[in-house]
Amino acid sequence: MAASTARILNAGGPPAFKIRAVLASMLSPSWGIYSGYELTENTPLRPGSEEYLDSEKYQYRPRDWDAAARDGLGIAPFITDLNRIRKSHLALHWLRNLRFHHVDRPELICFSKRVSGREITAAGASAGSTYGAGNITERPSVMAAPQAGEQGGAFSDTVLVVVNLDPHQAREATVWLDMPELGMGWHEGFTVTDELTGDSFRWGQANYVRLDPASRPAHIFTITRDLA
């Protein structure tokens, strides 16, 4: 999935770039960005154009990446965090485990990806891969511990994402989770930890969320279930 779309990005500033990067990197097992995305280059070739003015399609475009890093320009550290999260969580390596959850405002979107030990074992046996799905060849650097209710010590890995789709202002909503899709009962409580900030919260089926795109365009949560 590609994150770069000039028509969307040329009016949203850095928050729009972060929002698009979260969606592309968390929704799909593979993702890519156009050169210059890290620097939030967003000048269109012409008003409403899908092409960038500073595209390599039209010119040789050298960029001083080191200077940008020194000056704190762009979103390269944010993209590094997204790739770190992708590498750490096996659930993000799969495509068909994507599930959406209800949000009572259209400006926010919520989705999850979950994989259980049984699914990984079955997929690995059928695809000739140790960790399944045919496209997984390396064990992730971080694996979720066995969760309450998992059988035979098998681990599960769940990533829950909430994104503000509006790059211009803070939005708030109630997120209603489909608990069985997360491997839990409807009335179960649990702890979510934001992989971007380290913040933790107690959650259940219905949860209030407020996201300001200027400071926090998204939550990327991992889930810790209460011990049985």
Language model segments and positions:
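Carbohydrate-interacting/catalytic domains
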Residues: 3, 9-12, 17-18, 33, ...
